[in-house]
C-alpha cells in the first residue's frame, strides 16, 4: 500500500510540474494558481430549501416567544467569492445563494449573508487563501464576516461591538501542503490571535454527557472572565467548519459562548436551548453545506417544537413530577430525568 501511495503522489506531482495539471480526488486548479474543491454540477433541490427555511422560521418563533433573538448567518463558498478564478469552461450560476435569499425572505427569517461583503473585500484583500484550505475562508475573511454578524447581534444587544483589528495579534504561517494532502504548496496564510484569550475559561469538560450527533460532535463552552463581560449576552451558536476551529473570533464578544456543531444537532435545537438558556441564538452554515446531506429532510419537516407556556396562567394545571414514574441520572453539569407520561401527552414543560 505504501508503494502504491508513493506512486500516486509521484504521478500527481509530475502532472503538476510538467503539465500544470492537478490530478487529485479533492482539489482542482483554477486560474492564476487558485485551488478549489473539485467542481460539481449545481443542482439545488428547492424542496430542501422550503423545508429548511420553514424550520428556521419555527425556530425563530420559538426563540421570540421566549424573548430571545434568533439570527441565521449564511456564508459563501470560495467558488462564489472568487468566481473569476474558476477553471476555464466551468460556468457557475450561484444558484444556492439566489434560492436561499428568496426563501429566507419568503419565510421571514431574520438573517444575514456574507456573500456581497466578502466579494467586495476580495477586490482588495485575500479573504480566502489562494491555495491552502480551499473549503473555508481564511482569518481575514473570518474577521470581516464575523464583524458583520456582530453588527447584527448589536441590534439587540448594543453592548456587543464589532472587532477592531487591534483586538488581534496577526501573524502569517507558512503552509507547505494542501489540507489533508501531501500536495506541496508554499503559501503564507494569516493567523489571528485574540489578545483577550487569557480571560477565556473553557468549561466544555463540564458538559461531557451532552447529547451530540455521532457525525457532528464538535462543541465548546467558553466563559469570558474579563471585567465587564457580565454585561454581555450569552450566546448559543450552531456552527459549521467555518467557525469550529475559529472560536477566537467570537469568544470575547459574549459573556458565554456555547458552540454546537450544527447540521443534525440543530434539529434538536430545543434540547440545547433548554440546557444552555441563552440570551441569543445563532445558526451559521456554509453555502455548500446547506443541503439535505447535512440536514435531514425528515427532521426538518417533522420536528415538533413546544409553544411557550405561561406558567402563571396554567398554574392550576401543573402536576408534580412525583405523580409519574421517573429516573434521575446525574452527570457533570447535566441531570437527566426520564419520565413515563400518560398516552396522549403531546408536550412537557
Model-assigned labels for residue ranges:
Residues 1-349:
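Extracellular glycan-modifying ectodomains
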Amino acid at each position: 500500500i505504501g508503494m502504491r501511495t508513493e506512486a500516486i503522489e509521484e504521478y500527481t506531482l509530475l502532472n503538476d510540474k510538467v503539465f500544470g495539471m492537478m490530478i487529485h480526488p479533492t482539489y482542482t486548479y483554477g486560474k492564476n494558481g487558485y485551488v478549489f474543491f473539485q467542481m460539481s454540477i449545481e443542482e439545488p433541490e428547492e424542496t430542501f430549501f422550503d423545508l429548511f427555511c420553514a424550520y428556521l422560521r419555527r425556530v425563530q418563533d420559538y426563540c421570540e416567544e421566549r424573548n430571545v433573538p434568533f439570527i441565521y448567518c449564511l456564508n459563501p463558498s470560495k467558488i462564489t467569492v472568487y468566481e473569476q478564478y474558476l477553471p476555464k469552461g466551468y460556468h457557475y450560476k450561484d444558484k444556492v445563494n439566489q434560492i436561499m435569499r428568496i426563501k429566507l425572505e419568503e419565510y421571514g427569517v431574520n438573517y444575514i449573508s456574507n456573500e456581497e461583503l466578502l466579494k467586495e473585500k476580495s477586490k482588495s484583500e485575500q479573504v480566502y487563501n489562494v491555495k491552502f484550505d480551499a473549503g473555508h475562508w481564511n482569518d481575514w475573511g473570518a474577521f470581516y464576516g464575523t464583524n458583520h454578524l456582530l453588527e447584527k447581534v448589536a441590534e439587540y444587544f448594543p453592548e456587543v461591538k464589532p472587532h477592531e483589528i487591534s483586538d488581534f495579534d496577526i501573524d502569517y504561517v507558512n503552509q507547505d501542503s494542501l489540507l489533508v494532502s501531501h500536495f506541496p504548496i508554499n503559501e503564507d496564510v494569516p493567523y489571528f490571535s485574540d489578545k483577550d484569550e487569557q480571560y477565556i475559561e473553557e468549561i466544555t469538560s463540564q458538559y461531557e454527557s451532552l447529547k451530540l450527533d455521532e457525525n457532528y460532535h464538535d462543541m465548546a463552552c467558553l466563559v469570558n472572565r474579563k471585567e465587564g463581560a457580565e454585561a454581555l449576552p450569552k450566546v448559543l451558536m450552531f456552527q459549521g467548519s467555518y467557525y469550529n476551529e475559529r472560536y477566537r473570533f467570537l469568544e470575547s464578544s459574549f459573556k458565554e459562548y456555547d458552540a454546537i456543531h450544527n447540521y443534525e444537532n440543530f434539529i434538536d435545537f430545543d434540547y440545547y436551548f433548554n440546557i444552555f438558556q441563552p440570551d441569543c441564538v445563532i445558526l451559521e452554515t456554509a453555502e455548500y453545506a446547506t443541503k439535505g446531506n447535512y440536514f435531514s429532510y425528515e427532521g426538518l419537516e417533522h420536528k415538533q417544537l413546544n409553544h411557550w407556556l405561561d406558567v402563571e396562567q396554567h398554574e392550576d394545571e401543573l402536576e408534580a413530577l412525583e405523580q409519574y414514574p421517573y429516573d434521575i441520572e446525574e452527570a457533570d453539569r447535566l441531570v437527566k430525568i426520564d419520565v413515563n407520561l400518560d398516552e396522549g401527552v403531546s408536550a412537557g414543560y
